[in-house]
């Protein structure tokens, strides 16, 4: 897997990879990450992939991160509570 672009963003670390005839967009926020795969034949090139990172898309991504964080925190609390019962 090869890094082809690191996209500057004030909140997220956004990296675009090229691998196996696909572009992979990896968006990281703290300890969570989301990945999106796009077949390289479905886009004209890297500029088109980067253009997909609209404000609307990134707001949706942020909302998903919030939900992921809640889910993970709940799972952690549940596990900790179960350990204390033993």
Annotate each language-model stretch with its function.
Residues 4-7, 43, 49, 66:
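Extended aliphatic helical segments
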Residues 2-39:
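N-terminal acidic leader/helix
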């Amino acid at each position: 897997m090869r890094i082809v672009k690191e996209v500057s963003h004030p909140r997220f670390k956004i990296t675009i990879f090229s691998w196996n005839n696909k572009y992979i967009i990896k968006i990281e926020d703290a300890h969570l990450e989301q990945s999106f795969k796009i077949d390289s034949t479905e886009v004209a090139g890297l500029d088109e992939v980067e253009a997909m990172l609209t404000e609307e898309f990134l707001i949706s991504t942020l909302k998903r991160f919030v939900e992921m964080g809640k889910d993970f925190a709940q799972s952690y609390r549940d596990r900790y509570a179960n350990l204390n019962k033993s």
